[in-house]
């Protein structure tokens, strides 16, 4: 046939009318027994100007008849060869199959198009390299239960094959086949059906799983730990928020406990918690609240648990504080503060634990969330000997300005009660002083005040050092004033070591001629001054 004629046959849609049977036969547009054959659109044919079929249905009919000429024409019209093969199998036209065998490719691709189990099996036989297991697996995939029933005896004697087919049926979600295997054959592991049901949230498959499980329990001496299995299923269902799965499980036993509701909380399924929360003891609810804080549960879940406890959480306050800090979960603190009645302020308790155990970053974040004053945090840090925390917060709050930092820290030291905390703040002040290059004339007044501050707090070594530093500024008159005022402080507050240091500086000033005997005598005339200094040196100088 000429290529032009082939091209016309492939693309002609409207036949010149009328054409005789002989002409149509010559054109290859005639189907014996039906009449003229005409293409309509992209995927239909018209027979004898009357009957309309899809191209693929026409291919199946032609294949069943073994009519290769019509098959070739319909393939030109973009029909699917697989339908011709199906028709040939239905008509036992193996000669036609042989002609196209090289074009078929993988015969397994034809199987989804077949509804008849016998044709299905015949088609599978075209793949000479396949075995019975391959046939049975494809029968499962394409829901050919009758094929499995036909080969039941072969399956029965291969336990591993039974399990393979069962698991395949579960993954393909072929419930009829699953049920047949479950009742007709022995399955040693049922868990796959539940795994697939959970994965696809398929309740009907889950119900079927329990139907088979109970059948197995009642009819076989199966070694099944049913309570443990039920508990596992409840936890899994709760974690997935599958409330109806939980109802189905509870029909067969089991109970909802802390582990089950903890799973629901962890995966944020509040509806599951809401349904069962009133069925568990108060102690369990308290543990669930702690778990909710640990997993940073959303506001609605926390409120649900708090409401169940009537917002009374005093028995677990310490654990709550620990979880808030350890898991950086502060929402519960805010919710308890928002209550008009039964309000519980955990801010100070949480803050104390943060300062003791957590990082500077976590502490500052909490300060911002709850508007905590830096002074409060610094005092807590001083009590816990967190020097780094004091320094970092001071720098952050007071813009790393040395004079401002020292000013505020001095105020805190003045009001700090524990001596260890006071000493740590003073240590921090001196560190800031030393590392900030404040020993300049412009800072003379601030250094003067700082020296008196050290004297007031009996910080002996720092007092001595800052006095030596102050003297280098060449402010002799002011230095003398500082020394005399600090001597008065030492006497009034009973600080003998400060008094001794002052006495040394007074002698130094006297020998330099920067202070007179009268000034010294006046300073040492204070009540009880003789208890702190030895005036003999001055009397010797007079003689």
UniProtKB/Swiss-Prot annotation:
Keywords: Early protein. Induction: Expressed in the early phase of the viral replicative cycle. InterPro entries: MGF_505. Belongs to the asfivirus MGF 505 family. Plays a role in virus cell tropism, and may be required for efficient virus replication in macrophages. This is Protein MGF 505-10R.
